[in-house]
């Protein structure tokens, strides 16, 4: 699966994955979704984001969950 909307650039957000180089970290978008912010609200609050950005951020998170393990006890 090729993700074209997720960019990683050492000069943008210290190399954290971002949405299309917009200095909007994928983690921030996922955090908004995790706290119950709806897609429609995210798109209204951040008009430069597109529905496809949200979809691809979720795909990225799913790929990470397949390959990474996080110590939940910390």
Regions found by a protein language model. Name each.
Residues 1-40:
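A short, structured beta-strand/loop element
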Residues 40-44, 48-74:
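C-terminal structural segments of small proteins and small subunits
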């Amino acid at each position: 699966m090729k993700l074209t909307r997720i960019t990683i650039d050492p000069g943008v957000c210290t190399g954290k994955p971002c949405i299309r180089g917009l200095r909007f970290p994928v983690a921030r978008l996922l955090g908004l979704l995790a706290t119950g912010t709806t897609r429609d609200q995210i798109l209204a609050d951040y008009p430069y984001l597109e529905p496809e950005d949200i979809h691809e951020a979720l795909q990225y998170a799913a790929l990470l969950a397949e390959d990474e393990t996080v110590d939940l006890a910390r």
